[in-house]
Amino acid sequence: AGWARVRVRGPEGARVLVEYCELPSDRELVPDIHPSKLKIRVEDPDYASFYDKSINIRQQNGYILKGKGTETFECRFAYMGFQFVRVTADPGVTVERVEAVPVHTDVAEAGRFVCSNDVVNRLQDMSRASLLNNFHSIPTDCPHREKQGWTADTYMTDQAAIYNFDMAAFYAKWVEDLAGTQDSAGGLCTVAPS
């Protein structure tokens, strides 16, 4: 989870659009990424796309150039869940560099698991990355769609999070968010904050 940092050059008023997705459909691949090079092929545009039809959203941000040499921009007021970025621009714009910027709540490492099996070690690394992708002041369900603090999602991952990271302050704050959802009968909402 994070955003793209894009370095461009072009005329004043020219526009740049940055779109994000987890996995583009075959029809959305750019010419230099052939479908045969992907480990997973996706032909169903409803499953993966720069446009998620199931919830009618696009993860995107844009920029209008000042036209004064090389300009660098990044969307710092929202984060996206993505593995792929598509950058399109008006004529006359040169895209010089695109860089992924990961963002998450700063939680210190509390533990680490390493063994002699490279596959298990890679699985552990991916699990840690997935956890960090969902730490954004609350434990979220996903970094690209709802971005909500669903209690069941947190229940399913809290032990893994605690083994890997110092979660005391993070979870204490989120439990306060959860307490804030309590109604007059004592019931709690399934999403916190809400």
Named regions from a protein language model:
Residues 75, 147, 161-164:
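Short, charged/polar micro-motifs that form catalytic or ligand-binding hotspots
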Residues 87, 156-167:
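Well-ordered alpha-helical scaffold segments within catalytic/enzyme domains
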Residues 159-162, 176, 180:
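Generic alpha-helical structural context detector
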Residues 1-145, 152-153, 169-174, 178, ...:
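Extracellular/oxidizing-compartment recognition motifs
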